[in-house]
Regions:
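The substrate-binding groove and active-site-proximal loops of carbohydrate-active enzymes
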Residues: 13-20, 48-58
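Solvent-exposed loop and edge beta-strand segments that line ligand/cofactor-binding
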Residues: 13-24, 91-103, 158-182, 225-229
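Catalytic cores of carbohydrate-active enzymes
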Residues: 7, 105-223
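Hydrophobic core segments within long, regular secondary-structure runs in both alpha-
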Residues: 3, 30, 34-37, 50, ...
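Hydrophobic, small-residue-rich alpha-helical packing segments that form membrane-like cores
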Residues: 60, 87-111, 115
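Core alpha/beta catalytic barrel or barrel-like domain that forms the active/cofactor pocket
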Residues: 6-7, 43-51, 75-89, 211-214
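Hydrophobic or amphipathic alpha-helical targeting/insertion segments
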Residues: 19-50
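Single conserved hydrophobic/aromatic residue that forms the stacking wall/gate
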Residues: 1-5, 9
Length: 229
């Protein structure tokens, strides 16, 4: 985990060795570190000094805060996290657009971090990140909910991906699964979202990532529209 933390950049626009960032990468590190500390009991790990990938150094705990603050800052016009170079689904063209998945992942990571901060007695950080979590949750529920499910994101041109009016790519798995897994969705919305996943995405062979399948290329949405159904 400390090796992974050293891949966090003090300059936060550099990931994967290029001058831009994948919006989800660093966020996965937060719950990984928290779970590592829980399992091992190595509380002192949070204060271990590790270098940043570009220059300088900081504690693992400071790296975690830097990650959360970066995602809080890198948001679009609606307040949803920017997709930057890519999120988990590299086939979506979210450069300049906004990612529902990353906002839900951000919310999940914040709450994992709060648990650690509470255990360490860092009350100022608990207060700061509880406020951040409340804001992220409110934005997600206000901006991403569409009738019976959560949309997948918003392109740089303002087109919403995965809405009730879309003929193709109407429902996407990642945003709805993570709305529930993260705890950001209310019970009512979470149940509706999972009912929609069952209705549109569940098959005898597993759950599809989106449906109905894309058949018409749309470069505003991305390469996902060019992948064979």
């Amino acid at each position: 985990a400390s090796s992974a933390a050293s891949d966090v950049y003090k300059r936060q626009d550099i990931i994967h060795g290029i001058e831009d960032a994948c919006s989800d990468d660093a966020l996965w590190l937060i719950p990984s570190i928290v779970e590592y500390i829980k399992e091992t009991g190595e509380i002192e790990f949070a204060d271990q000094i590790v270098p940043y990938a570009d220059k300088g150094e900081g504690t693992v705990y400071e790296h975690m805060m830097r990650i959360l603050d970066f995602s809080a800052k890198e948001v679009g016009a609606t307040g949803i996290c920017l997709g930057l170079r890519a999120d988990w689904n590299d086939c979506l063209n979210l450069g300049g657009g906004e990612s529902a998945l990353v906002s839900f992942l951000h919310y999940w990571a914040i709450n994992n971090f709060i648990e650690l901060a509470q255990y360490l007695g860092r009350d100022d950080d608990v207060k700061k990140y509880k406020e951040m979590a409340t804001h992220v949750k409110d934005v997600c529920n206000n901006e991403l909910w569409d009738k019976d499910w959560f949309i997948r994101g918003i392109t740089k041109n303002g087109k919403k991906i995965g809405t009730s009016t879309d003929k193709e790519g109407k429902v996407h798995l990642e945003s709805n699964a993570w709305a529930v897994l993260s705890g950001a969705a209310s019970e009512e919305k979470g149940i509706k979202a999972m009912d929609s996943v069952k209705e549109y995405l569940a098959t005898p062979y597993g759950i599809m990532l989106n449906a109905p399948s894309y058949t018409v290329p749309d470069d505003d949405i991305g390469f996902i529209t060019r992948v064979y159904p």
